[in-house]
């Protein structure tokens, strides 16, 4: 048995740069730009999904993308400096789609005949709902309530939650890749080939460029290939879905984007407030808290840091609430969460440096003001990003499951909790999503639209369903007798900021701010 024994390891050993170590500046800049290119996929996808339904034009969509990128840069910088201080990119969230769809379909907005006017009024309604709903994260974060709740977490409970943060994104993987298999599949194979089979090839000095910059290299190659296919007329006469997924000549997005535009608060006009809209939006805020918590825990492991203590998690959620407030003030059209794909990129490149993400935030802010520049990159076909998602989401899921090494997986109790939370965490949201797709309304369908949006949003989130099941069962089944089996002897020292000496190294605030905001 000794030959097959792999003792649990608190920190991953295969990473080259941890949270506090930094690559050389030229490498840092390229890695930061790679993070920017990756987060563009979600930043362009959400407005493409929502803006037309709101009545917006291509010009409106370009402006929303700019605003989303600009605010994402600010949120990422704030989170990396004053929040969890983990190398996590904060961007637009798809968890907000259901409550936003409820607002879009509000009868008072639907009766506006002019499309542009309807877009403006809908955007203002979304802004008002985000501003009110942001108070949930701000209060739960800065009051340390979320930190108190996190004391119920254990390695056994967090393994399926973090796993579902990755696995729950499966619809953005091969289903989107398959819409243009001739672009998506080569991208998938190329990334796997370069990062796994050619990672030791170093044509330039000692930098493993294929492992360090796979997105820059692969996106460039496959994008050029896609341009050639489009120019050669390969998609002429093809179904509209194929053309939309494969073609690169999205001239409207580029032509309607301004050369220079500086997003500013209340640029769409004063927000409007509705009790129903705000309650509906609160569900998405709760979901994004759960998903971000799982993403933070995954990011900490991929950055060779300790699991974030309760105080740090609460601090991060509080700053994320500030981010949602900024979304409402600027009008990004959606709320925010930690982008799971960028967390996966830490593992793919083996670089967990905080500085890389901070520089990436600078790219987001600067390039968001240069409309045409950002629009060019935003026109990268979705299947290219879907291929990356297959790898990166899967990697985050595996990081989550790696927490099971600290538990006793020969225990039927632990097997039951892990299996049930993983299975139902995928099965329940999929059932809700299929119901929505078939009928264009959720499984919960009463006369109270805000109530429908609230519950449907909660149960369409794999990580949230997984958290409810895993944490409840883990804290109600043979708790005292199973402390060691649950992994608590290892986990308990990370509950408090001073429980492990390394926490101070990883999570202390800059500029000596801990004097004014001491850990609780």
From Swiss-Prot:
Query: What organism is the protein native to?
Result: Arabidopsis thaliana (Mouse-ear cress)
Q: Kindly state the tissue distribution recorded for this protein.
A: Expressed in cotyledons 4 days after imbibition (DAI). Expressed in the minor and major veins of cotyledons and leaves, in the shoot apex and pedicels. Expressed in the root meristems, root tips and lateral root primordia.
Give the family this protein belongs to, as stated in its UniProt record. Belongs to the nucleobase:cation symporter-2 (NCS2) (TC 2.A.40) family.
Whether Transport counts among this entry's keywords is yes
Q: Which GO terms describe its cellular component?
A: membrane; plasmodesma
- MF GO annotations: transmembrane transporter activity
According to the record, the segments passing through the membrane are: 36-56, 64-84, 86-106, 129-149, 150-170, 174-194, 213-233, 279-299, 362-382, 384-404, 415-435, 453-473
Q: Which InterPro entries match?
A: NCS2
Has the keyword Cell membrane been applied to this entry? no
What's the protein's topology in the membrane? Multi-pass membrane protein
Where found, per UniProt? Membrane
Q: What protein is this chain from?
A: Nucleobase-ascorbate transporter 1
Which UniProt keywords are given for this protein, alphabetically ordered?
Membrane, Transmembrane, Transmembrane helix, Transport
């Amino acid at each position: 048995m000794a030959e097959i024994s792999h003792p649990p390891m608190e920190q991953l050993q295969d990473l080259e740069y941890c949270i506090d170590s930094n690559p050389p500046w030229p490498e840092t800049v390229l890695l930061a730009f790679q993070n920017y290119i990756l987060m563009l996929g979600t930043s362009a996808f959400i407005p493409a999904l929502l803006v037309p339904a709101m009545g917006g034009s291509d010009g409106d969509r370009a402006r929303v993308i700019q605003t989303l990128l600009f605010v994402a840069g600010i949120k990422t910088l704030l989170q990396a400096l004053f929040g969890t201080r983990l190398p996590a990119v904060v961007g637009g969230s798809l968890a907000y789609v259901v409550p936003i769809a409820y607002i879009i379909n509000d009868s008072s907005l639907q009766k506006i005949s002019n499309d542009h006017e309807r877009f403006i009024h809908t955007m203002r309604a979304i802004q008002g709902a985000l501003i009110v709903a942001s108070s949930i994260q701000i209060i739960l974060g800065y009051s340390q309530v979320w930190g108190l709740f996190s004391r119920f977490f254990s390695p056994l409970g967090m393994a399926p939650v973090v796993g579902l943060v990755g696995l729950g994104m499966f619809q953005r993987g091969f289903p989107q890749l398959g819409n243009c298999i001739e672009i998506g599949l080569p991208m998938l194979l190329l990334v796997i080939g370069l990062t796994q089979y050619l990672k030791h090839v170093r044509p330039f000095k000692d930098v493993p460029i294929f492992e360090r910059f796979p997105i820059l290299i692969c996106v460039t190659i496959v994008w050029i290939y896609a341009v050639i296919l489009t120019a050669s007329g390969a998609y002429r006469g093809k179904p509209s879905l194929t053309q939309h997924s494969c073609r690169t000549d999205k001239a409207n997005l580029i032509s309607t984007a301004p050369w220079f535009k500086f997003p500013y608060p209340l640029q769409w006009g004063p927000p409007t407030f509705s009790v129903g809209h705000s309650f509906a939006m609160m569900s998405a805020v709760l979901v994004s808290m759960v998903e971000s918590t799982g993403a933070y825990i995954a990011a900490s492991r991929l950055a060779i840091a300790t699991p974030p203590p309760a105080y740090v998690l609460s601090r991060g959620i509080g700053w994320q609430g500030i981010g949602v407030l900024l979304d409402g003030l600027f009008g990004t059209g959606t709320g925010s969460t930690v982008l799971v794909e960028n967390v996966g990129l830490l593992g793919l490149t083996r670089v967990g440096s905080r500085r890389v993400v901070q520089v990436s935030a600078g790219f987001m802010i600067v390039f968001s003001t240069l409309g045409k520049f950002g629009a060019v990159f935003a026109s990268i076909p979705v299947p290219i990003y879907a291929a990356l998602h297959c790898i990166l989401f899967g990697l985050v899921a595996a990081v989550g499951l790696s927490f099971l090494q600290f538990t006793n997986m020969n225990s039927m109790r632990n097997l039951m909790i892990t299996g049930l939370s993983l299975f139902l965490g995928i099965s329940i949201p999929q059932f809700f999503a299929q119901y929505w797709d078939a009928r264009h309304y959720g499984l919960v369908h009463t006369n109270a639209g805000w109530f429908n949006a609230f519950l449907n949003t909660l149960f369409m989130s794999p990580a949230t369903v997984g958290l409810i099941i895993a944490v409840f069962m883990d804290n109600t089944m043979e708790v005292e007798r199973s402390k060691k089996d649950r992994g608590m002897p290892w986990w308990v020292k990370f509950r408090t900021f001073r429980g492990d000496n390394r926490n101070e190294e990883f999570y202390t605030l800059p500029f000596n701010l801990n004097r004014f905001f001491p850990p609780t």
